[in-house]
């Protein structure tokens, strides 16, 4: 799901169930409450993740015992490391469980095409490791 596809005003009230959501937000509320796990993908902006991502989880804050994968990217050498650290704080604050293995993508334009296709095949191992570890955590938390 792409947060940009949904037009959330800045937080007006926390949504505690799909039924409590305004009609136009009920489809995303059902997805958020029904999700068993999340992978958060964001570019780094000014040392943190996007405001749209923060606003989404402000609307739907309680994600107890759900696995979270963190993927950050930047054109620079650090690959969104500062944003990843901020996301770990967010995950903790909404009672999620962060996968210790994150996918940090430095020089993103050299690793992925604009359509998301992996173009640096040497980076495939990092993607595979992240995916395997996140799936392991998500499966364990679901029991």
Feature-to-residue mapping (PLM):
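N-terminal beta1-alpha1-beta2 submodule of the flavodoxin-like/Rossmannoid cofactor-binding fold
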Residues: 1-58, 117-143
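Mobile beta-alpha loop/short-helix "lid" or hinge segments that flank ligand
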Residues: 1-10, 61-63, 95-114
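Short, surface-exposed connector motifs at secondary-structure boundaries
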Residues: 37-38, 65-69
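Short glycine- and Lys/Arg-enriched binding-loop motifs that mark or flank ligand-binding interfaces
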Residues: 43, 72-76, 112
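A glycine- and small-aliphatic-rich helix-loop capping segment at beta-alpha/alpha-beta transitions
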Residues: 55-63, 89-93
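Short, glycine-/small-residue-rich phosphate/pyrophosphate-handling segment
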Residues: 68-107, 118-125
């Amino acid at each position: 799901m792409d947060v940009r596809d949904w037009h959330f005003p800045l937080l007006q009230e926390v949504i505690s169930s799909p039924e409590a959501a305004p009609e136009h937000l009920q489809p995303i509320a059902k997805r958020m409450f029904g999700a068993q796990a999340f992978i958060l993908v964001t570019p780094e902006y000014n040392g943190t993740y996007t405001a749209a991502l923060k606003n989404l989880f402000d609307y739907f804050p309680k994600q107890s015992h759900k696995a979270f994968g963190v993927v950050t990217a930047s054109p620079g050498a650090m690959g969104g490391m500062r944003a990843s650290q901020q996301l770990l704080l967010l995950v903790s604050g909404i009672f999620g469980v962060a996968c210790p293995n994150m996918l940090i993508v430095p020089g993103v334009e050299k690793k992925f095409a604009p359509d998301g296709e992996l173009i640096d095949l040497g980076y495939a191992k990092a993607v595979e490791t992240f995916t395997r570890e996140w799936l392991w955590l998500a499966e364990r938390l679901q029991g």
